[in-house]
């Protein structure tokens, strides 16, 4: 999850998230908003910032999936708003450096603030990573904005990105009450 706050995490805990997803890694680079991972199975080697990103802390944790170690990372890059174009591109370029970490298999999830039409996002994917929605044949996954009364979701800026050799199955866009982003639910075969 992205843009978590202490109050939001407290409400998740009060609602009983730990009964379903008892393992978590939540971090904040500014002390206000953060990003988090929740898991039903233990998160090995949890880290506050796996990417060393200038945009935000992007926490990571490794999950054993049938004997395979898969590193999950919660992504939130800089928004491409006027005055922040360089920072936006840099935050995607920093993610692209992860292609060089060949000793680890990754699944990146979250708000990339970029669509497949953006060159920096495609550069991040390179020849190693794949967008799960495209891999699954789902097509467009418009996920933002969900909170506009007279405007439908028109931007697919949220993604689940898979490492090579993984296969995406079903992909579904789900509105989340109180959020301006929809969630993506994706089934993955890690192979």
Where are these regions (language model features)?
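Soluble catalytic domains of enzymes that build or remodel membrane lipids, polysaccharides, and related
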Residues: 1-191
């Amino acid at each position: 999850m992205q843009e978590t706050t202490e109050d939001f995490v407290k409400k998740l805990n009060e609602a009983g998230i730990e009964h379903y997803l008892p393992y978590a890694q939540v971090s904040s680079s500014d002390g206000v908003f953060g990003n988090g991972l929740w898991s039903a199975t233990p998160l090995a080697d949890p880290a506050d910032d796996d990417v060393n990103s200038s945009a935000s802390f992007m926490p990571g944790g490794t999950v054993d999936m049938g004997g395979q170690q898969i590193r999950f990372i919660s992504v939130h890059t800089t928004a491409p708003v006027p005055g922040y174009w360089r920072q936006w591109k840099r935050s995607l370029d920093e993610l692209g450096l992860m292609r060089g970490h060949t000793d680890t298999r990754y699944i990146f999830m979250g708000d990339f603030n970029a669509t497949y039409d953006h060159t920096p996002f495609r550069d991040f994917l390179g020849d190693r990573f794949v967008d799960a929605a495209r891999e699954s044949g789902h097509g467009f996954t418009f996920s933002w904005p969900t909170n506009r009364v007279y405007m439908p979701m028109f931007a697919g800026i949220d993604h689940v990105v898979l490492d090579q050799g993984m296969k995406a199955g079903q992909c579904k866009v789900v509105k989340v009450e109180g959020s301006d982003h929809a969630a993506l639910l994706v089934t993955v075969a890690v192979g």
